[in-house]
Structure formats: structure tokens, C-alpha cells
Amino acid sequence: MSVYFPIHCPDYLRSAEMTEVMMNTPSMEEIGLNPRKDGLSYQIFPDPSDFDRCCKLKDRLPSIVVEPTEGEVESGELRWPPEEFLVQEDAQDNCEETASENKEQ
């Protein structure tokens, strides 16, 4: 019993057919880039003057606005100001308010 099965696939070309394809295909020199109808040639690399103009426009950094979130903090996420600082600050504010109210009376 043989386990060898010949593969008959029409997608693959035999060597003689491939040779014929290679002989009838135009070479890379014949293909070349043709200019467009408006007479301008194709430009593969950017023009250095465009690069200088682009850099001058990027002198300013864009404005980035970050809004604080009021949601729960995920584990491991750092928040500023730390919660301990906020608790201490609130306690100080409450003490100052109480002291000012006592002075007014």
C-alpha cells in the first residue's frame, strides 16, 4: 500500500509553462514609471522643502486638556492628589471654619 498521492493542482505551473511566462513578461526596465497626463512625474520621496515647512508648523505643541474623573480608582492606579492628602486638607478646612464661626459668636 502506497501513501504517496501525486498532487494534481492546476494552480501550479509546470517548469516549461513557467519558463514561457518568464520569457513573455516584460522586464523591469521596460515597465518604468510613465508621467501622468498633467505632465508631472511621480514623486516617490518627499520634497525636503516640504519637510522644513512642516517642521515650522510644528513649533507649537497641541493643547491637551485632561478632565478629572469622579469614578472609582482601579487597583494599582495612582491618583493625584493622594486620598490621604485630601482627607487631611478637608480636616484642616473644617477646623478653620469651626474656629472662624466661634470667633464670630
From Swiss-Prot:
Q: What is the lineage of its organism?
A: Eukaryota, Metazoa, Chordata, Craniata, Vertebrata
Q: Which family does it belong to?
A: Belongs to the LBH family.
Q: Name one GO cellular component term.
A: nucleus
GO biological process annotation, one example: regulation of MAPK cascade
PANTHER family for the chain? PROTEIN LBH, PROTEIN LBH-RELATED
The name this protein carries in UniProt is Protein LBH
Q: Which domain of life is it from?
A: Eukaryota
Q: Which residues form the LBH domain?
A: 18-104
- List the disulfide bonds in this chain: none
Location in the cell = Nucleus; Cytoplasm
Q: Which residues form a coiled coil?
A: none
PTM-bearing positions, type Phosphoserine: 63
Keywords assigned: Cytoplasm, Developmental protein, Nucleus, Phosphoprotein, Transcription, Transcription regulation
**Protein purpose:** Transcriptional activator.
Supply the InterPro entries for this chain.
LBH (IPR013294), LBH_dom (IPR038990), LBH_dom_prot (IPR042945)
